[in-house]
Amino acid sequence: MPKVFISYSWSSDRLVLELAQRLISHGVDVVLDKWELKEGQDKYAFMERCVNDPDITKVLIICDRVYAQKANNRTGGVGDETVIISGEIYGKMKQEKFIPIIAERDDEGNEYLPAYIK
């Protein structure tokens, strides 16, 4: 069974929950902080474990304006994940684990993407 971790900002919360439920209905094992991370647990360790876990075959990056801003400014949980994910992406010539999902575009139709994905 495929296993995915979803990286997102809370601004896409509803979209993420709908996507997670759809993936589960198609037999995908979904790891989501909202479901897995318990109060008091180290969120940075959780994110690092998810990104580096060999059983997690894909990391879906839900890209909207807020996610891109937080990633580029290294703020909040998104900023923490960016530090981990960008190292993985830059460290490998060919990578297929990290998949950006475009959740929002600007008024000109441009995708909101963090700098490390562009």
Model-derived regions, located:
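Short beta-alpha junction loops
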Residues: 65-66, 101-108
